[in-house]
Amino acid sequence: YKRVEPLDILLALSINNVRALLTLTLGLMALIWSLTWDFRMDSPGLALCVYLLTISMAVGFGICLVFLGKFNKFITRLIKRLINRILIFTSALFFATFELPAHTRPFVTWNPLLHAVELFRYSLNNEYPIPDISLSYLIWCSTVTLGFSLILYRTNEALLLESLDD
């Protein structure tokens, strides 16, 4: 048999997490439909595109964290405790971007997760206002994050293989 690569393990974990999140999302949509007998999705293609871009960005971010954790455990703890909270708080899960004053929006629109959440809301209802939100920014962030992580993996694969042999 072919030797299992570290990327195979990371991708298997990612696929399992995506499967779980997709099941929860579809279950929630089915629950909404069964309770209200009304469910509309104005742009299902946009919703699928945003969902896949968010997944690819998360996989890239996870691969980067694996390598950062190999170099310094403190960075991993810092990212898990502090940076994750900042990303979640500024990702528009608790507020809508159009409710913010225009002069405060630049402080949160740097977050690509905010763009993903707002674009997903827009795909459900095309009348939802999305000021300063861009699909191209989400595509750029996903591509750069995944590309950087794959380059990092390719150049430092031996480091992971050495640590697995211990």
Q: Which role does the model predict for each range below?
A:
Residues 95-130, 134:
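Short hydrophobic, aromatic-rich alpha-helical segments embedded in or entering the lipid bilayer
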Residues 140-166:
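Junction motif at the cytosolic side of a transmembrane helix
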Residues 9-10, 120, 156:
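Hydrophobic alpha-helical elements at and bordering transmembrane segments
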Residues 6, 11-78, 133-140, 146-150:
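Alpha-helical transmembrane segments and their short interhelical loops
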Residues 56-65, 93-94, 118-122:
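Juxtamembrane membrane-interface segments at transmembrane alpha-helix termini
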